[in-house]
Every structure is written in C-alpha cells, then in structure tokens.
C-alpha cells in the first residue's frame, strides 16, 4: 500500500514547533514576528488565500499586517508600499499576493522586496542564491514539497525527478531544489514532446503545470513517488494536476489532493517569516 504524504498533519506538527519558537522570541526580545500581506484588487480567491495566511499567523502567535490596495493601483504606487514595508523594522516578512492586476509590472514589484524579507521566495536575487546553493528563502510551495519528502524519508539523491511545469514560483524553483538535493532532474512543459514517455521514467514526479489531471495515472511507473502541487475545484472538492484515483496501486508514496502540498505551502511561508524574525531580532 502506498504511503500517503499527509501535508495537513505535517503542517500541524510544524506549527506546534513554530508556536514554541515565537513564544521564545517574544520572551527574549519583547517583539512579535509580523508578516505583511499585500492584496491588490478584488480577486476572491486571492482574498481567501490572504485570509488563510493571516489565520496561520495567529495560530503560531504571530501578527499579520494587511495592506489592501484598489484594482487601479499603479506599479509606482505598489512599489512605494513595498518600500515602506522594507523600511519598517517591525515587519519581518513581505508577501505580495499573486496575481496582481494586468497594468502592474509584477516582476518589478516582486524584485523590490528586500531579500531579508522575501519569505515567499519570489525575488530573482533569492532564486539565484538558492540555485547556487547560497542562503535564501525558497519559493514556499516547492520548499514545502522538499520538507514533505525529507520528513517522510523519501530518498532523492540519485533519483530521476520529472517536474511538469516551469513557472517562476513553482516549476523552476522545484527543479533547482531537487537538483541541489542531488536528483537528476528533467523539466517538462506545454511544448514538451513525448510527455508520457518522460513521465514514465520518473522515480519522483511533480505535477506543477496548472492543468486539471493532465498527467495520467497510466503514465506513472510502478513504485514512483507522486507529488501533486495542483488544485482545481470540482464537485465540491477538487483535483490536482495528476490523475490520483487508484494511484495507491501504482505509487510507493503520494500527496493527496486536497491535504497534501497545499497546507505545507502556507506553513512554509510562516516558518520562513519566523526565521526572518529570529535573524532580525537576534
């Protein structure tokens, strides 16, 4: 029977540890770690994600500072808000909720975030440092996936990992993190030819493509580790990027959808904010 990589249970365990660390930091410095979240516009899903992150802050004893900006906000106005947060010594982490309205240069705004406060791992500088094996906060979803693999004693070194997806916040950093852990990595995307054949070679498969059940169950080889980073609402529940029905008969381990990667994304963001606060406050 396949091992279920339960992200929800692991996230709860990590949050319990973070609560202790936050209390220790408060006792030592009299200061509370603060995550600033910036929401631009009125996208309902984005507002939900920001609320979930605020709830996670409260669970570990942190504070969150919510910045809400109107839909018509310009790049210059958003950059000015980010600069204020960079300069605010009470703020230890900055999250710019993706996506932003089309008129905003999202990349310029991500890269304006101070490296020390880039707890969501979105800056080019942070990505470059991570890719070179230097200290930086990793993009939250792939960093959460690496924690799931590590905590479940999944062997990565020497394994063939296939990452399906090449986005700047998921596919690319995921591939770099697996490479740093000594996997042999193949990156696939929408233009990849012979995708089923490449997936069949994977010891570890990561679905990060953003298309519901694109990766078919019969593409996956016996004994593979299956990580599904996608979520697509369906019939009151949801599915991922990988066809998971019956996957326990094929995989040696897999992340369920929901309850696998998702909870660890938010917990990783919170953990990296606590780490940033510990560094800033000594």
Curated annotation (Swiss-Prot):
<feature type="binding site">
    <location>
        <begin position="165"/>
        <end position="167"/>
    </location>
    <ligand>
        <name>NADP(+)</name>
    </ligand>
</feature>
<keyword id="KW-0511">Multifunctional enzyme</keyword>
<comment type="similarity">
    <text>Belongs to the tetrahydrofolate dehydrogenase/cyclohydrolase family.</text>
</comment>
<dbReference type="GO" id="GO:0005829">
    <property type="term" value="C:cytosol"/>
</dbReference>
<dbReference type="InterPro" id="IPR020867">
    <property type="entry name" value="THF_DH/CycHdrlase_CS"/>
</dbReference>
<keyword id="KW-0368">Histidine biosynthesis</keyword>
<keyword id="KW-0521">NADP</keyword>
<feature type="binding site">
    <location>
        <position position="190"/>
    </location>
    <ligand>
        <name>NADP(+)</name>
    </ligand>
</feature>
<dbReference type="GO" id="GO:0009086">
    <property type="term" value="P:methionine biosynthetic process"/>
</dbReference>
<dbReference type="InterPro" id="IPR036291">
    <property type="entry name" value="NAD(P)-bd_dom_sf"/>
</dbReference>
<dbReference type="InterPro" id="IPR046346">
    <property type="entry name" value="Aminoacid_DH-like_N_sf"/>
</dbReference>
<keyword id="KW-0554">One-carbon metabolism</keyword>
<keyword id="KW-0486">Methionine biosynthesis</keyword>
<dbReference type="GO" id="GO:0006164">
    <property type="term" value="P:purine nucleotide biosynthetic process"/>
</dbReference>
<dbReference type="Pfam" id="PF02882">
    <property type="entry name" value="THF_DHG_CYH_C"/>
</dbReference>
<comment type="pathway">
    <text>One-carbon metabolism; tetrahydrofolate interconversion.</text>
</comment>
<keyword id="KW-0028">Amino-acid biosynthesis</keyword>
<dbReference type="GO" id="GO:0000105">
    <property type="term" value="P:L-histidine biosynthetic process"/>
</dbReference>
<protein>
    <recommendedName>
        <fullName>Bifunctional protein FolD</fullName>
        <ecNumber>1.5.1.5</ecNumber>
        <ecNumber>3.5.4.9</ecNumber>
    </recommendedName>
</protein>
<dbReference type="InterPro" id="IPR000672">
    <property type="entry name" value="THF_DH/CycHdrlase"/>
</dbReference>
<dbReference type="Pfam" id="PF00763">
    <property type="entry name" value="THF_DHG_CYH"/>
</dbReference>
<dbReference type="GO" id="GO:0004488">
    <property type="term" value="F:methylenetetrahydrofolate dehydrogenase (NADP+) activity"/>
</dbReference>
<keyword id="KW-0378">Hydrolase</keyword>
<comment type="function">
    <text>Catalyzes the oxidation of 5,10-methylenetetrahydrofolate to 5,10-methenyltetrahydrofolate and then the hydrolysis of 5,10-methenyltetrahydrofolate to 10-formyltetrahydrofolate.</text>
</comment>
<keyword id="KW-0658">Purine biosynthesis</keyword>
<dbReference type="GO" id="GO:0035999">
    <property type="term" value="P:tetrahydrofolate interconversion"/>
</dbReference>
<dbReference type="InterPro" id="IPR020631">
    <property type="entry name" value="THF_DH/CycHdrlase_NAD-bd_dom"/>
</dbReference>
<keyword id="KW-0560">Oxidoreductase</keyword>
<dbReference type="GO" id="GO:0004477">
    <property type="term" value="F:methenyltetrahydrofolate cyclohydrolase activity"/>
</dbReference>
<dbReference type="InterPro" id="IPR020630">
    <property type="entry name" value="THF_DH/CycHdrlase_cat_dom"/>
</dbReference>
<comment type="subunit">
    <text>Homodimer.</text>
</comment>
């Amino acid at each position: 029977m396949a091992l279920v990589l339960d992200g929800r249970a692991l996230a709860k365990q990590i949050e319990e540890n973070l609560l202790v660390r936050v209390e220790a930091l408060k006792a030592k410095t009299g200061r509370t770690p603060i995550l600033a979240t910036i929401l631009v516009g009125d996208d309902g899903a984005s507002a939900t994600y920001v609320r979930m992150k605020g709830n996670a802050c409260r669970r570990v004893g942190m504070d969150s500072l919510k910045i809400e900006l109107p839909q018509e906000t310009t790049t210059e106005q958003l950059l000015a808000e980010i600069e204020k947060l960079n300069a605010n010594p009470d703020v230890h982490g900055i999250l710019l909720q993706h996506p932003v309205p089309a008129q905003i240069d999202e990349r310029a705004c991500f890269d304006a975030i101070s490296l020390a406060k880039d707890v969501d791992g979105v800056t080019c500088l942070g990505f470059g440092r991570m890719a070179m094996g230097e200290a930086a906060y990793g993009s939250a979803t792939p960093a959460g996936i690496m924690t799931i693999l590590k905590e479940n004693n999944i062997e990565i070194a020497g394994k063939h990992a296939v990452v399906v997806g090449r986005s700047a916040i998921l596919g690319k950093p995921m591939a770099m993190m697996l490479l740093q852990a000594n996997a042999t990595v193949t990156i696939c995307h929408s233009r990849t030819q012979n995708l089923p054949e490449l997936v069949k070679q994977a010891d570890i498969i990561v679905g990060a493509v953003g298309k519901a059940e694109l990766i078919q169950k019969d593409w996956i080889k016996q004994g593979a580790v299956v990580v599904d980073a996608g979520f697509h609402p369906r019939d009151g529940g949801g599915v991922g990027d990988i066809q998971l029905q019956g996957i326990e008969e094929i995989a040696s381990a897999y992340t369920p959808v929901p309850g696998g990667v998702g909870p660890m994304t938010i917990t990783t963001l919170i953990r990296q904010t606590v780490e940033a606060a510990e560094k800033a406050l000594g």
